[in-house]
């Protein structure tokens, strides 16, 4: 009988990262998905990255994940979002050729060491003594394993809505999974419903682009992966149009036919990626909403109209689309729809993504209440790493709010839970100036090397980059001019008679890399080198980063301050009954986690610390 150390159920963005990470750690891994086309399928928009999301992709890449490298084999429109603002909120993004993305992902996974792929459907999980034992396929055959990672996306009791029409499906033309939903309910997991949606797809050959605005990509695409030197995929343009008052009138007149507004849908949709119906209702004073016309491939005429996700009936969808400039004669290739699905309250999992109820069972992706490819992939890689480390009886791998966006996301989910699809934003991170897309590898790759999840190829690239940073830093500390000479170049510095190095000059608010190259022409060769920009950012924001590091040190000290499992909060008289009940319910394992529970006051935290010092004066927990 076949037996695996780790089985991953689901071949979406969470599943492929989980399976690959597990396999990289040397344990036998099986990835089960319905069909080959499902591997890395982009169910909704054909793009990777964005504000905060791009940082997640860079972090996945830093841990030797697949997403960054694969998008570099398929990216057809690269754009750095928010580049006119500070580097903490820069958002690398790339439009993808769907076919190229799936092709690259398939080629990688089907040749991955320690990884097998099975095309089939899992109906049940065999559990013995509150521990996973095997998966059960729809033909009743069993495959034993030590660990299971569920990455089911929108397939758990999935239900598509188009107007009043309901179609049981995990996505278009694919069956939902009822068996696994039943299993999770039987075990006693807290399950609820969420909703997401997608816009209609349209034929680009029938668009009048003269009525739209051109949206070019960056002149020089910046790769996501440290393994990619240059993006060799041809680059194309996107276009922008907008809704009109006529569009809005049609939607308002037909709101009662929308599955979302008729009461037909129970699940809560994503707050920050609303349907067009939701936009018209929530932002009723706006006269127009932008629509991004995004090509789905180099040799594919399908266009993804980003911004008009809808669950309106077929006839209404056709009607409203034709009121949009440039789309008056457009042909609809596929209708938009909403989809409802089951998810599990993420407070049912620990920060390793292992469930608290069942040993050896891990959740990653939309099953935990998140939305987005990048959020799913970030969870997948952590679940895969921890499942494999558990098989090897090694310490678990935990990212924190202080070192990664992935850590912020997991901490938010496991501490607060979510009642709506969770999306990553830069504003969710207290330390976003330190957790930038450009330094993801410097933050995380060494951690990955320490646990053995990083390939030799990436290890060499990382080591070389680290050496190059030190060499460049040394050079920038060597190149200098006197303040008087700099003044003659119209560079405003205090005339104290000292020499100013390039790194000193970078700290001047108005001074930039282009000026440095003008003064020191030898830096021109490094202009396209990410290292020069990295050091520029580090120097420019040095004082802020120093203060933020102090905050991080305080955070880490609180995270290290453990709370015993058997603590009785009702024996701490100086905190209110409400707070005692909250702490007893959440069961935080550290002072840091306790502080982040909504409603827990600073005074209560002080009381807990004093209580622990008094009761456990010898530093031991009983």
Swiss-Prot record:
SUPFAM superfamilies: FAD/NAD(P)-binding domain. It is found in: Cytoplasm. Signal peptide: none annotated. One of its GO terms (molecular function) is flavin adenine dinucleotide binding. PROSITE patterns: GIDA_1, GIDA_2. SMART domains: GIDA_assoc_3 (SM01228). Keywords: Cytoplasm, FAD, Flavoprotein, NAD, tRNA processing. GO terms for biological process: tRNA methylation; tRNA wobble uridine modification. FAD binds at residues 10-15, 122, 177, 366. It comes from the Bacteria. NAD(+) binds at residues 269-283. NAD-binding protein involved in the addition of a carboxymethylaminomethyl (cmnm) group at the wobble position (U34) of certain tRNAs, forming tRNA-cmnm(5)s(2)U34. This is tRNA uridine 5-carboxymethylaminomethyl modification enzyme MnmG. It comes from Rickettsia akari (strain Hartford). The gene is mnmG.
């Amino acid at each position: 009988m076949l037996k695996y150390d780790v089985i991953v159920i689901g071949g979406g963005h969470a599943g492929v990262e989980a399976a690959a990470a597990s396999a990289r750690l040397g344990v036998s891994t099986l990835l089960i998905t319905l069909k080959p086309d499902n591997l890395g399928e982009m169910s909704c928009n054909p793009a990777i990255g964005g504000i905060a999301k791009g940082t997640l992709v860079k972090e996945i890449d830093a841990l030797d994940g697949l997403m960054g490298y694969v998008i570099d084999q398929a990216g057809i429109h690269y754009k750095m979002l928010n580049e006119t603002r500070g580097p903490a909120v820069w958002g690398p993004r790339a439009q993808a050729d769907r076919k190229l993305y799936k092709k690259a992902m398939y080629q990688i996974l089907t040749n991955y060491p320690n990884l097998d792929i099975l095309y089939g459907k899992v109906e049940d999980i065999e559990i013995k003594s509150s521990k996973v034992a095997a998966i059960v396929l729809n033909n009743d055959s069993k495959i034993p394993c030590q660990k299971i990672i569920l990455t089911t996306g929108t397939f758990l009791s999935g239900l598509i809505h188009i107007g009043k029409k309901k179609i049981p499906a995990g996505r278009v033309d694919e069956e939902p999974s009822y068996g696994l939903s039943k299993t999770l309910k039987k075990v006693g997991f807290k399950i609820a419903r969420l909703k997401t949606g997608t816009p209609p797809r349209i034929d680009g050959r029938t668009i009048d682009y003269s009525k739209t605005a051109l949206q070019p990509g960056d002149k020089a695409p910046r790769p996501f992966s440290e393994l990619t030197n240059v993006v060799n995929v041809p680059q194309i343009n996107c276009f922008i149009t907008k809704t009109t008052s006529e569009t809005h009138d049609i939607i308002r007149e037909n709101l009662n036919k929308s599955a979302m507004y008729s009461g037909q849908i129970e699940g809560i949709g994503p707050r920050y990626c609303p349907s067009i119906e939701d936009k018209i209702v929530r932002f009723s004073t706006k006269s127009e909403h932008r629509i991004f016309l995004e090509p789905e491939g180099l040799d594919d005429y399908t266009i993804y109209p980003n911004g008009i996700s809808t669950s309106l009936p077929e006839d209404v969808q056709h009607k409203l689309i034709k009121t949009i400039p440039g789309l008056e004669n457009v042909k609809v290739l596929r209708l938009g729809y909403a989809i409802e699905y089951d998810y599990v309250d993420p407070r049912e999992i620990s920060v390793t993504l292992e469930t608290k109820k069942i040993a050896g069972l891990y959740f990653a992706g939309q099953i935990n209440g998140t939305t987005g490819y990048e959020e799913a992939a970030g969870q997948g890689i952590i679940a895969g790493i921890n499942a494999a480390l558990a098989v090897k009886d090694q310490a678990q791998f935990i990212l924190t709010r202080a070192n990664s966006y992935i850590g912020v996301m997991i901490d938010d989910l496991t501490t607060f839970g979510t009642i709506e699809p969770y999306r990553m934003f830069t504003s969710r991170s207290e330390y976003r100036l330190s957790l930038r897309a450009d330094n993801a590898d410097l933050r995380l790759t060494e951690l990955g090397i320490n646990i053995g999840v990083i390939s030799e190829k990436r290890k060499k690239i990382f080591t070389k980059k680290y050496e190059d940073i030190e060499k460049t830093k040394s050079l920038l500390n060597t190149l200098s001019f006197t303040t008087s000479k700099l003044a003659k170049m119209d560079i405003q510095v205090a005339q104290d008679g000292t020499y100013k190095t390039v790194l000193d000059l970078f700290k001047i608010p108005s001074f930039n890399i282009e000026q440095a190259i003008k003064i020191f022409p030898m830096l021109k060769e490094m202009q396209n080198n990410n290292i020069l920009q990295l050091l520029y950012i580090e120097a420019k924001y040095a004082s802020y980063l120093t203060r933020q590091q102090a905050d991080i040190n305080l955070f880490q000290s609180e995270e290290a301050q453990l709370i015993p499992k058997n603590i009785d909060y009702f024996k701490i008289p100086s905190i209110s009954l409400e707070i005692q009940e909250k702490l007893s319910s959440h069961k935080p394992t550290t002072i840091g986690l306790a502080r982040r529970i909504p409603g827990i006051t600073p005074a209560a935290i002080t009381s807990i610390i004093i209580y622990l010092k008094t009761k456990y004066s010898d530093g031991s927990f009983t």
